[in-house]
C-alpha cells in the first residue's frame, strides 16, 4: 500500500502533514493487513539529512509522523526536499531520501541520481542509487528477509 501525503505549505520552505492528514494516515495504515508492504511518501524530510546544507526542512510535525510510521510498522518512507540521496533505518522502517535527476541548482556537486528499490519474494530488499552523471548503479542498502518483516 502506498500513501502519498501532501507536505508543502504555501509560501514556506518547511512542510507539515497536519492533524487531518495524520488522522487519515493513521486510519488507513491501521486497517491494513500486517503482511502488506507499507510505503508513505511526502516531499519534506522526516529527519535531518547530512550534506543538505543549513536548511534541514524537516516536517513541522516530524515527531508525530515518525511515531506514527514506527508504530504502524511502515516499511518505507520516501522523501527528498534537499536533493541528497540518503538511506537510514530506524527500527523496521527504512527512510529513503531521493537526490535529483535534473536539477544541478542546489546539490549539483553530488551529481544527478535516483533510487531503485528491489523487493524480492523472500522478503529481502536491495536499494540502489542510480547515478545518472556517472551512469553507475551503487548499492546503498541491503536487508535480508529477517529485517524486512
Model-inferred region functions:
Residues 1-9, 39-43, 94-100, 128-129:
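Active-site-proximal beta-strand elements of phosphoester/diester hydrolases
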Residues 1-36, 55-63:
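Binuclear metal-dependent hydrolase catalytic cores centered on His/Asp/Glu-rich metal-binding motifs
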Residues 9-11, 44-48, 83-85:
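Short, catalytically relevant binding-site loops at active-site mouths
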Residues 10-12, 103, 124:
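Short, acidic Gly/Pro/Ser/Thr-rich loop/turn segments
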Residues 33-37, 74, 122-124:
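A general structural motif
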Residues 34-51:
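Short acidic, glycine-rich surface-loop motifs adjacent to enzyme active sites
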Residues 52-122:
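Conserved beta-sheet core of the metallophosphoesterase superfamily
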Residues 120-149:
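A short C-terminal boundary segment appended to hydrolase-like catalytic domains
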Amino acid at each position: 500500500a502506498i500513501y502519498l501525503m501532501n507536505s508543502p505549505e504555501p509560501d514556506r520552505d518547511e512542510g507539515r502533514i497536519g492533524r487531518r492528514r495524520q488522522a487519515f494516515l493513521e486510519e488507513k495504515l491501521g486497517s491494513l493487513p500486517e503482511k502488506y508492504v507499507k510505503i508513505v511518501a511526502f516531499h519534506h524530510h522526516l529527519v535531518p539529512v547530512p550534506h543538505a546544507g543549513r536548511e534541514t526542512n524537516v516536517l513541522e510535525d516530524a515527531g508525530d509522523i515518525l511515531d506514527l510510521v514506527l508504530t504502524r510498522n511502515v516499511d518505507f518512507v520516501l522523501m527528498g526536499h534537499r536533493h541528497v540521496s540518503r538511506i537510514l533505518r530506524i527500527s523496521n522502517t527504512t527512510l529513503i531520501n531521493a537526490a535529483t535527476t535534473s536539477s544541478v541548482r542546489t546539490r549539483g556537486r553530488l551529481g544527478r541520481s535516483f533510487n531503485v528499490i528491489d523487493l524480492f519474494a523472500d522478503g529481502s530488499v536491495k536499494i540502489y542509487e542510480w547515478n545518472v552523471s556517472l551512469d553507475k548503479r551503487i548499492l546503498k542498502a541491503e536487508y535480508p528477509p529477517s529485517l524486512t518483516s
